[in-house]
């Protein structure tokens, strides 16, 4: 009810704050017998870990995961899996100047109006720090999906600010800090980010996520559509302001003769629907695009108010990502995997498939 759990049969409950002792999650509903060790999860966490390049927050967190329960002798037991990640490099003093004011574009104001109290340290519960447990849970989902169905979930950045990144090769994605699928564009991205940091400003990005290998039939009609659940999950990622599948908003300019993929004995002739029709998977790749807004914590002074409603000028200190999108790719992959494993289990429960 309080919005901290994702999923129906494969449930992930996320807990913690940016500057608390630890963050983590409880994964409930994981099938028993899945080989699992901390290294399986750590590999994914290392992909989103802060402080790995000059273009992301310089907060130094090892993000070492601890498996507290649900695994015995290297396999899952079917009971809840507790995952813990300790916070080791919080600097709460950096936020003393915004304890009583609200950052423009940040959740500060909305949290205060909802709860009547807020934790200003690193954004508290609204911090992107809370995506680490999501990635940890997603690592479990990815491994199960790959083992059971051969499903592969991966993503990349297709645009950073005004710079479009033409797709060249999946092989280029892990070789740079941006998850860019085109190594030739990386120097331009680096130069842009260096100038952005000097300006004390931030920028948005576009992320693409693709799931391949899943069968047709996953998803429920009407209100539990597969695409609806994907959009719901993706909007839970900090700074996401838009989600589309397949051709997305480009569908507006398409005619039905173009958008509706013809079906042949060999399969579909196109995939403008992004792998989902009627809320149910078609067996084609699931393709998702995310629009991520610029980070709201910047050094540029902006107008705001304090808790008394008085006008103030706000400048955010501390260590922040000038572009949340740079580390968003592994998070978006995790969220897509979590939705897919949930629907895979629901399909098995209802239809036996």
From Swiss-Prot:
CDD domains named in the record: Chorismate_synthase
Any one GO cellular component localisation term in the record: cytosol
PROSITE patterns: CHORISMATE_SYNTHASE_1, CHORISMATE_SYNTHASE_2, CHORISMATE_SYNTHASE_3
Amino-acid biosynthesis as UniProt keyword: yes
Protein's UniProt keywords contain Nucleus: no
Binding site for FMN: 125-127, 238-239, 278, 293-297, 319
Source superkingdom: Bacteria
InterPro entries per the UniProt record, alphabetical: Chorismate_synth, Chorismate_synth_AroC_sf, Chorismate_synthase_CS
GO MF term list: chorismate synthase activity; FMN binding
Residues that hold NADP(+) according to the record: 48, 54
Pathway recorded for this protein: Metabolic intermediate biosynthesis; chorismate biosynthesis; chorismate from D-erythrose 4-phosphate and phosphoenolpyruvate: step 7/7
EC numbers for this chain: 4.2.3.5
Cofactors named for this entry: FMNH2
The protein's enzyme class: lyase
Keywords: Amino-acid biosynthesis, Aromatic amino acid biosynthesis, FAD, Flavoprotein, FMN, Lyase, NADP
Cofactor note: Reduced FMN (FMNH(2)).
Gene Ontology BP terms: amino acid biosynthetic process; aromatic amino acid family biosynthetic process; chorismate biosynthetic process
Catalysed conversion reaction: 5-O-(1-carboxyvinyl)-3-phosphoshikimate = chorismate + phosphate
PANTHER family linked to this entry: CHORISMATE SYNTHASE
Family in the record: Belongs to the chorismate synthase family.
Record's subunit section: Homotetramer.
Function: This reaction introduces a second double bond into the aromatic ring system.
Name of the protein this chain belongs to: Chorismate synthase
Organism of origin: Bordetella parapertussis (strain 12822 / ATCC BAA-587 / NCTC 13253)
Classification of source organism: Bacteria, Pseudomonadati, Pseudomonadota, Betaproteobacteria, Burkholderiales
């Amino acid at each position: 009810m309080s919005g901290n759990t994702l999923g129906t049969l494969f449930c992930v409950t996320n807990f913690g704050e940016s500057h608390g002792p630890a963050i983590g999650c409880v994964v409930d509903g994981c099938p028993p017998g899945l080989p699992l060790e901390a290294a399986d999860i750590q590999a994914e966490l290392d992909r989103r870990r802060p402080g790995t390049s000059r273009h992301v927050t310089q907060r130094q967190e090892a993000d070492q995961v601890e498996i507290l329960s649900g695994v015995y002798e290297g396999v899952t037991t079917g009971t809840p899996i507790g995952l813990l990640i300790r916070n080791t490099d919080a600097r709460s003093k950096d936020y003393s100047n915004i304890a009583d004011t609200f950052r423009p574009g940040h959740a500060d104001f909305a949290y205060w109006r909802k709860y009547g109290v807020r934790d200003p340290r690193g954004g508290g519960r609204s911090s992107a720090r809370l995506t680490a447990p999501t990635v940890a849970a997603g690592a479990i989902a990815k491994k199960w999906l790959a083992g059971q169905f051969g499903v592969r979930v991966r993503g990349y950045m297709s645009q950073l600010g005004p710079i479009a990144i033409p797709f060249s090769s999946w092989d280029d994605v892990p070789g740079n800090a941006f998850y860019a699928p085109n190594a030739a564009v990386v120097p331009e991205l680096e130069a842009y980010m260096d100038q952005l940091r000097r300006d004390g400003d931030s920028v948005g990005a576009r992320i693409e996520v693709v799931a391949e290998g899943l069968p047709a039939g996953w998803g429920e009609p009407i209100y539990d559509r597969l695409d609806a659940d994907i959009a719901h999950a993706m909007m839970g990622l900090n700074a996401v302001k838009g989600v589309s599948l397949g051709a997305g908003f480009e569908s507006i300019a398409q005619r039905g003769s173009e958008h509706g993929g013809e079906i042949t004995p060999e399969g579909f002739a196109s995939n403008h629907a992004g792998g989902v029709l009627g809320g149910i998977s078609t067996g084609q790749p699931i393709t998702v695009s995310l629009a991520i807004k610029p980070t709201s914590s910047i050094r540029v002074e902006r107008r705001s108010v304090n808790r008394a409603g008085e006008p103030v000028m706000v400048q955010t200190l501390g260590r922040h990502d000038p572009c949340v999108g740079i580390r968003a790719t592994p998070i978006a992959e995790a969220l897509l995997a979590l939705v897919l494993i949930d629907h895979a289990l629901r399909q098995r429960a209802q239809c036996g498939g």
